[in-house]
């Protein structure tokens, strides 16, 4: 009997290590502005390799508004922007009497702007460590906590250094090793904005990111967790071509004195005017071509973008390729190259989804699905109990999982 305590302790240690090693790993990678059709238009052998080995969706439908911050946070939380509250890259909150801006460090790191529970918070609350390299929301205590390891956004941080960070995190000892790592790259979005989606420069950017994808695939092969690693590759939205001749000057159709405009380009809010004038402005703008105009109560249900108090009185959505000017400082020349923020039903706004690893089927192509389903997917793979207050549903994409994970 004297040997029992020692044996029992040994059993607990072995069982604990087995439990940790038995839990899968997930690497979630985002390539900003990677339009789904880029995989067909341009030479992408490494993305193709990932698709052939695992799963590829025809496209992934972003949430509206088709902007970077709302969609990255929807991927993280499984919620539409209307529910998590990050309704745009820049917006005013009347309750806070403050404006959220993606370049405002104090706002980005302030948890009060973020609703919902990000996947890293779900994991951390259940004792599963996570790490983030530049994912939207991870620099704040959104949902009540942060990843065990996270990096403050640095646009100039080299791509290879980002990969080095991921590799180093997965090489940590089991007790401190994250089971979920999130990684963000700002290309090919930057090239798409400047040069447009159908340009030589964007083609080069896509091919450069394909090389980055190849480097990731090659580097993870040497990781101790490789056989348990599931790689999920996404983007937040696509990109549409724009030019200065396809512009909408609101001043040509109505008098907006007394109104505040929030956002230009594909999408714009108007608010703050007198109530009786609001309906006149609405009626006036309904006559404008190349634009859809909605009172807040009339915003289509399919957009899931009408109930949050941060949504303003009037929503204007330009038709694909058209740009809404700033009515106080109209400057058509700035609207050239590419942009996003349009209706999320448009193929040009659709994102990519590819995945490979033991959790996924091999060589499987499936139809388009919404990005809010990523959260429950990752929760399932990591054996987590998901937040129930979400819009996504694992059943919507369970067909991509290997039989032992369904």
Question: Which stretches of residues belong to each language-model region?
Answer:
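Active-site neighborhoods of enzymes that stabilize oxyanions during catalysis
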Residues: 262-365, 369-377
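His/Asp/Glu-rich, glycine-adjacent segments
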Residues: 79-196
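A long, amphipathic alpha-helix that forms part
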Residues: 159-171, 188-229, 378
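Bacterial Sec-dependent N-terminal signal peptides
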Residues: 1-24
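Metal-dependent active-site segment of extracytoplasmic phospho-/sulfohydrolases and closely related
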Residues: 28, 46, 208-249
